[in-house]
Regions:
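Transmembrane alpha-helix segments characteristic
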Residues: 198-207, 400-410, 419-434
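Short acidic/glycine- and proline-prone juxtamembrane loop motifs at membrane-interface regions
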Residues: 40-51
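Transmembrane-helix motifs of polytopic, lipid-linked glycan transferases
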Residues: 1-17, 59-64, 406-413
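Transmembrane-helix signature of polytopic, membrane-embedded enzymes
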Residues: 2-37, 74-76, 420-430
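Membrane-interface alpha helices of multi-pass inner-membrane proteins
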Residues: 31-33, 81-95
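Perimembrane helix-loop-helix junctions
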Residues: 69-70, 102-167, 171-196
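Lumenal/periplasmic acceptor-binding loop at the mouth of the active site in multi-pass
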Residues: 217-413
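Membrane-interface transmembrane helices that cradle and orient dolichyl/undecaprenyl
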Residues: 10, 14-22, 61-81, 110-119
Length: 434
């Protein structure tokens, strides 16, 4: 997929004569093999996790929008690619939410192909891209199940109908609305609305892969986290409530006092005896309300876990743990730990080299990025030749001498010069997926 995507993009940058030399094929081979043997992807591919499959869906969706872009001027049925993309996004939700982050890039490619460029249009397209991502992630995914759950509780508890009757009726209503929208849009010759409704429909069809969870949970498997046996309990699973809440834009710090507690949403479970849904946890006084004087903008140091508090001290030289951390200290933790240690270090593992495969916590001899150039590595990490043999000869050690990084930067500048629109779309993909 990466090979064909790169070739399509490269073909747009070079002349017809250059295409005949096969230079775009060479670029695609280098691109795809670089990714294949990159540290992050290789690690994802050999561990029992969801990230390799998630990367596959991300690559497949991006390849599909490139195919749409190539077909749209000559094929009147090219919108099938947009519907295919919606279906893939729905399917990918059942693997990992990470695949949704390709949506902004898709919106920008659509904008650049369908509309004449203007500054205002460009800004609006970027805003629409983020809003569409938020719409799918925050509204369609959770609220579809939330509404199904509310229907289920109302029809079972209030109307004394059998279990699942509310869910079935909700799906009947949803399907009826979709059919009506498709018929009306075709009757009134509105192809864009028709395509949008079809895309939404196929997004839901892909999303229905979550039914597998309900089926397996009803089989009472040994691992049955949150027990999502019906629409009512599935919402808790989808909202990842077991992970808690992390303040991103505004919120408390690790030492902020709790002033009061608010009530959360009650948890309903099936009761086979009464044939109703009963409250197993009313979640009264379950949401802490923090002292407003102890909250702030962009709180990075908010966890009360003592191990995390120790990390805050280590990465920011925080001395007084009783006072509210300053915004400067928050930014220091953000840049030193979250950006440098948790992002840039991983980035350089792929583009410069990796010291070893030992878990690193900021020390000089474990898990850092290296380049292979001693005068650079020794400035950052000290003499590498004096490390013990089990670290010097570690099988996870790689040195690329910045070659992947240099190739990437050359490609970035060349691409930006030749086709800034495509460059921005691909940058959004890179930025959102990290």
């Amino acid at each position: 997929l990466l090979f064909w995507t790169t070739k399509k993009i490269a073909d747009k940058l070079i002349s017809k004569k250059a295409k005949e030399t096969g230079i775009s094929i060479l670029a695609a081979i280098i691109s795809s093999l670089t990714y294949t043997f990159s540290d992050s992807f290789w690690f994802s591919a050999v561990e029992g996790e969801v990230y390799a499959m998630s990367s596959f869906f991300t690559a497949l969706v991006f390849w599909a929008i490139i195919k749409w872009e190539a077909d749209v001027d000559t094929n009147p049925k090219s919108n099938k690619w947009l519907i295919f993309i919606a279906f893939l996004i729905g399917l990918s939700i059942g693997v990992h939410m990470l695949s949704l982050l390709v949506i902004p890039a898709i919106v920008l490619i659509y904008y650049f192909k369908k509309f004449s460029f203007s500054f205002n249009g460009f800004i609006i397209a970027n805003i629409v891209a983020v809003l569409l991502l938020g719409l799918i992630y925050n509204i369609i995914i959770p609220q579809f199940v939330n509404l199904a759950g509310k229907f289920e509780i109302f029809f079972v508890n209030e109307l004394s109908l059998p279990f699942n009757s509310g869910t079935i009726l909700f799906f009947v209503i949803t399907i009826s609305i979709i059919i009506a929208a498709l018929v009306l849009s075709k009757k009134h010759n509105q192809p864009n609305i028709n395509t949008a409704v079809l895309a939404f429909t196929f997004l839901l069809i892909g999303y229905m892969s979550f039914f597998t969870l309900i089926i397996r949970s009803n089989a009472n498997t040994p691992i049955d986290e949150n027990s999502p046996e019906d629409a009512v309990s599935l919402l808790s699973y989808l909202n990842r409530e077991q992970y808690g809440f992390s303040p991103l834009v505004h919120g408390q710090y690790f030492n902020t006092e709790v002033e009061d507690y608010a009530n959360g949403n009650p948890v309903y479970v099936k009761d086979e005896k009464t044939k109703k849904y009963i409250i197993s946890d009313d979640r009264k006084s379950s949401i802490p309300i923090y002292d407003s004087n102890g909250t702030g903008l962009f709180p990075r140091m908010w966890s009360r876990d003592q191990r995390h508090v120790e990390a805050y001290k280590e990465w920011t030289d925080l001395k007084n743990l009783k006072r509210k951390p300053s915004f400067r200290e928050n930014l220091k933790f953000f840049f030193s730990f979250q950006i440098n240690h948790m992002y840039f270090r991983y980035f350089m593992w792929n583009f410069a080299g990796k010291q070893n495969d030992q878990q690193g916590h900021g020390e000089l001899n474990n898990g850092n990025w290296i380049s292979g150039f001693n005068f650079i590595d020794e400035q950052r990490l000290g003499p590498q030749k004096t490390l013990p043999d089990h670290l010097k000869k570690n099988k996870g050690k790689n040195t690329y001498y910045f070659l992947p990084l240099i190739l990437g930067l050359i490609g970035l500048f060349f691409h930006a010069q030749k086709n800034p629109k495509d460059t921005w779309s691909i940058f959004l993909l890179f930025f959102f997926t990290g």
